[in-house]
From Swiss-Prot:
Protein species of origin: Bacillus thuringiensis subsp. konkukian (strain 97-27)
Protein family (similarity comment): Belongs to the TPP enzyme family. MenD subfamily.
Pfam family, one: TPP_enzyme_N
Entry keyword annotation includes Transmembrane helix: no
Protein role: Catalyzes the thiamine diphosphate-dependent decarboxylation of 2-oxoglutarate and the subsequent addition of the resulting succinic semialdehyde-thiamine pyrophosphate anion to isochorismate to yield 2-succinyl-5-enolpyruvyl-6-hydroxy-3-cyclohexene-1-carboxylate (SEPHCHC).
HAMAP family: MenD
Gene this chain is encoded by: menD
Gene Ontology molecular-function annotations: 2-succinyl-5-enolpyruvyl-6-hydroxy-3-cyclohexene-1-carboxylic-acid synthase activity; magnesium ion binding; manganese ion binding; thiamine pyrophosphate binding
Protein name in the entry: 2-succinyl-5-enolpyruvyl-6-hydroxy-3-cyclohexene-1-carboxylate synthase
Catalytic activity: isochorismate + 2-oxoglutarate + H(+) = 5-enolpyruvoyl-6-hydroxy-2-succinyl-cyclohex-3-ene-1-carboxylate + CO2
Associated pathway: Quinol/quinone metabolism; 1,4-dihydroxy-2-naphthoate biosynthesis; 1,4-dihydroxy-2-naphthoate from chorismate: step 2/7; Quinol/quinone metabolism; menaquinone biosynthesis
CDD domains in the cross-refs: TPP_PYR_MenD, TPP_SHCHC_synthase
Length: 584
């Protein structure tokens, strides 16, 4: 028997088997020659689920979506050359959104590097600082020591991806020809296997009792507090944060991605309209918290970030399991390295019950006044983009997922996703906030989250049209709501809008595309709605039937800005009147 083929088969077989033993059971594969042995072994292993995606850029985001939804590592596999470079945007997003991806790139052997060989480039540390760890795997050798090495390296890399903060890792595999493994070999998956795996298990760190006692003592004298919950908070944060809020009397400013705004838990302490009322100058100048406790990433709301930045005299506690200093407002006074749950549990156990005071009632009152005013948009006959969110939430069933694209959809979700007793999971790519790969990420998530509705602008939709292929290949169920304002709607809210001479060509960027034929090409249904009743019917139909459904609602960018500002202005008047009335 060819010793090379035996070494290739057993060495890479040990690697693939170890992935499955470590619960990495999903891999997104893009076709290529140099990655052949790994791809074939993955397809052959009964413990591995393989998904084909021919476009590596889309494949990267597709894997990201699966990993976000499953909350566990997902592997990516491609051949050498620019194929690997196309993963870069998804790797960047995974790193900053703390999603564990196992990036596997095949490569030419060392003798074919830097000598002009085809499809060969430097793949060492290809993703730079956007992966937690890189390793160049050794060439396959036929020895028990090397089979064990393959498994131990796999364990190290998976541990790195899964320990806080989670993130992507990169393994580069140089492989010599011939590339076809021998599946007739006995015990193909058993080489190098030990009785136990060596992955580090991370639990919730125990809070030091001295710090907890000190903090409880301080908080007991701080009546004006805020609990701020951003994205990537722990899945059980709703239960623990609301219990902490009840103990302290501090309102919870819940980002939509915290998933605290919806569900069966008590939402008495939850504030959902802060993005609107924190624009009020009188409120910002007069409401001064003593302490802010923040979980998860920075919230979507710019108004909230600016409010936080002004609180230079407050105690500002950032809770982060990894201990990273995530404080773009530059006002944190303490960073506590602990899980959200460990932190909340420790305080809940020892905090005395602090009665709800005027501070909480002020936030609750202004929140309700703001919500009443914002709901006036439900009387608008025109296609107002904010109403897209409220009408989707209205028809989504219990347990559904709303995926919000970047740019305007996530901001409208922040402003118009009000508290609901239905459990509706909200997802988005808020690592580096790009508009690329949104369709692919949502489709990856839809493999686990069903039904899933994606809200996306026309430019973001165009940007990732290739991603629709996954819906066809893997028979996925998704409803995509395309808010088509023929351009980049968010720029109409920014100072660039005043530069009328060059605005449309540089920022508005209308592309004037009809997406109907593209959607049908990928086997989906397409509907362009006129009116809110038809909109709700189409979204509901899409969420309750199988397949790819695209619902397009056309809006006017200028009109949308006017309506947003009209709502904000009326809300500011209501808030100012209410605040002035309270001060008398």
């Amino acid at each position: 028997m060819n010793n090379h083929i035996e070494a290739l088969s057993y060495y890479l077989g040990a690697f693939v088997d170890e992935l499955t033993r470590l619960n990495v059971c999903d891999v997104v594969i893009s076709p290529g020659s140099r990655s052949t042995p790994i791809a074939l072994l993955m397809e052959q292993h009964e413990g591995m689920n393989t998904y084909l995606h021919v476009d590596e850029r889309s494949a990267g985001f597709f894997a990201l979506g699966i990993a976000k939804a499953k909350k566990r590592p997902v592997a990516l596999l491609c051949t050498s050359g620019t194929a690997a470079a196309n993963y870069y945007p998804a790797v960047c997003e995974a790193f900053h959104s703390r999603v564990p991806l196992i990036v596997l790139t095949a490569d030419r052997p060392h003798e074919l590097r830097d000598v002009g060989a085809p499809q060969a480039m430097n793949q060492i540390n290809l993703y730079g600082t956007f992966v937690k760890q890189f390793t160049e795997m050794a060439l396959p050798e036929a020895s028990e020591a090397m089979y064990h090495y393959a498994r131990m390296t796999t364990q190290r890399m998976i541990a790195s991806a899964c320990l806080a903060p989670q993130g992507p890792v990169h393994l580069n595999f140089p492989v010599r020809e011939p590339l076809i493994p021998d599946f007739s070999l006995e015990s193909l998956w058993d080489k190098g296997r030990g009785e136990y795996t060596g992955v580090v298990q991370q639990g919730n760190a125990v809070m030091p009792s001295e710090y907890v006692d000190s903090l409880v003592g301080r908080l007991s004298h701080m009546k004006k507090g805020l609990i701020i919950c951003g994205d990537d908070s722990h899945s059980e944060i709703a239960t623990f944060a609301t219990q902490l809020a009840e103990k302290t009397g501090y309102p919870i400013l819940a980002d939509p991605l915290s998933n605290i705004r919806s569900g069966h838990h008590d939402k008495t302490m939850v504030i959902d309209c802060y993005d609107t009322f924190l624009r009020n100058e009188l409120l910002k100048e007069t409401w001064k918290p003593d302490v802010l406790i923040r979980f998860g990433g920075m919230p979507v709301s710019k108004a909230l970030t600016q409010f936080i930045k002004k609180q230079t005299k407050a105690v500002h506690i950032v809770v982060d399991e990894s201990g990273q200093w995530r404080d773009p407002a530059l006002v944190a006074t303490e960073v506590v390295q602990a899980s959200d749950i460990a932190f909340c549990s420790a305080l809940i156990e020892k905090m005395p019950v602090m009665k709800k005071n005027d501070w909480f009632r002020m936030w609750q009152h202004i929140n309700e006044k703001t919500k009443e005013t914002l709901r006036e948009m439900e009387t608008y006959d025109t296609a107002f983009e904010g109403r897209v969110i409220t009408d989707i939430v209205r028809v989504l069933p219990e347990g559904a997922t709303l995926f919000a694209s970047n740019s305007m959809p996530i901001r409208d979700t922040d402003s118009f996703f009000f508290t609901s007793d239905k459990t509706i999971q909200v997802m988005a790519n808020r690592g580096v906030n790009g508009i690329d790969g949104i369709i692919s990420t949502a489709l990856g998530a839809s493999m686990i989250c069903d039904p899933l509705v994606l809200v996306i602008g026309d430019l973001s939709f165009y940007h990732d049209l290739n991603g629709l292929l996954a819906a066809k290949l893997h028979e996925l169920n998704i409803t995509i709501v395309v808010v088509n304002n023929d351009g980049g709607g968010i720029f109409s809210f920014l100072p660039q809008y005043e530069k009328k001479e060059h605005f449309e060509s540089l920022f508005g960027t209308p592309i004037g595309l009809d997406y109907e034929h593209v959607v049908t090409m990928y086997g989906g249904s397409f509907s362009r709605v006129n009116g809110w009743e038809q909109f709700r019917e189409e979204v509901q139909k899409g969420a309750t039937t199988e397949g790819l459904h695209v619902v397009e609602i056309c809006t006017n960018r200028d009109e949308n800005v006017t309506l947003h500002r009209k709502l904000w202005a009326k809300t500011q008047d209501v808030i100012t009147t209410s605040l002035q009335g309270e001060s008398k």
